[in-house]
A protein has these predicted regions:
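Catalytic cores and adjacent flexible loops of soluble metabolic enzymes
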Residues: 1-318
Length: 318
């Protein structure tokens, strides 16, 4: 597949931080940024800009907050752009510098469809400071179609560059990705639509390809799939698939060998039966993460069948 408009956004540090409370050493993050930059990755997302009133710096690493000084220790000006994510309702409006004074190019606003008004308000504030803005509608598999349509119609009226289709729970199959991709693209003329997939059913790469075929032009990936629970589409697969001469997979392969094989053994992201169960049942992974933690600590966790049965009774949207 070669389409020059397609861009890759690597979210290893941001999404992967959900597995280690963003406790990545700065020398490692610097190596990750440099490797991804040399690989030609278009955007490198280095974490969240979170309000310390909600998250204690004593319990979370620096990439939960992405202070400008910390970012400048690991990133540098190059063709790859720095991205940072913000959560609706967990962000201090006073924490943003004018874009001309920041190494950050884009902020991605993570929101649920029901909070789209707040997301647009935050996005407008960020946009007024000169940044690129993306809105990522989380948990699309839990959104009623009428609610999604209303959110997309509102986003169509903004001047934000990007809107993302997000399969937060790894629930979607190809038919749903194709249908939703067409919906987003039809409702958002003039905007670039992105896709972020989780690998609960080992479909993150396949579903990303389906999005590409339909016309999605910015793709989320992470090195070795690092991310919450089952993880994400892998950056290295995207680099190999896109056949764009600007991309070079070799720096990412070197990073995997140096850092991520060991980290995966320690943190246990990737396909596991409990994560698969939460995916096929369209459930938040908090329960499967708790199950896996109990197994790792030698605590009673129950059988897979017992876990499946327990998830059948869960009715929770967050």
């Amino acid at each position: 597949m070669y389409r020059p408009e397609i861009k890759i956004l690597d979210c290893t540090i941001r999404d992967g931080g959900l597995m280690n409370n963003w406790e990545f050493p700065k020398p490692m993050v610097k190596e990750v940024f440099d490797g991804l930059a040399r690989a030609g990755v278009d955007y490198i997302e280095l974490g969240y800009r979170a309000d310390k009133a909600f998250f204690s710096p004593e319990k979370h690493g620096p990439w939960r907050f992405c202070a400008e000084a910390d970012l400048r220790e690991v990133a540098y000006e190059c063709d790859s752009k720095v991205s940072v994510m913000v959560d609706v309702g967990r962000t201090d409006y006073d924490d943003f510098l004018p874009a001309r004074d920041s190494i950050i190019t884009m902020f991605r606003v993570a929101t649920y469809a029901k909070e789209i008004d707040k997301a647009i308000h935050l996005g407008n504030h960020i946009k007024s400071l000169g940044y690129e803005v993306s809105v990522n509608i989380m948990a699309a598999s839990h959104v009623l179609e009428i609610e999604l349509d209303e959110a997309l119609d509102q986003l169509a009226q903004t001047n934000f560059e990007y809107v993302y289709l997000v399969d937060s729970f790894g629930y979607f199959y190809s038919e749903q990705v194709q249908w939703l991709s067409e919906k987003y693209l039809n409702k958002l003329p003039g905007k670039t639509v992105g896709i972020h997939c989780h690998n609960n059913q080992q479909l993150a790469f396949a579903n990303t390809i389906d999005g590409i075929i339909k016309g999605i032009n910015i793709l989320d990936g992470s090195i070795y799939g690092m991310g919450r629970a089952a993880g994400n589409c892998t950056t290295e697969l995207l680099l190999g698939f896109l056949k764009n001469p600007k991309y070079d997979i070799r720096p990412v392969l070197a990073l995997i060998e140096k850092h991520f094989i060991r980290m995966k053994d320690e943190l246990k992201w990737g396909y596991e039966v409990p994560y698969m169960i939460s995916g096929i049942l369209n459930k938040h992974p908090r329960f499967s993460l708790e199950y896996m933690k109990n197994v790792a600590e030698g605590k009673p966790a129950g059988s897979f069948v017992e876990f499946y049965n327990s998830q059948m009774t869960v009715n929770e949207l967050d």
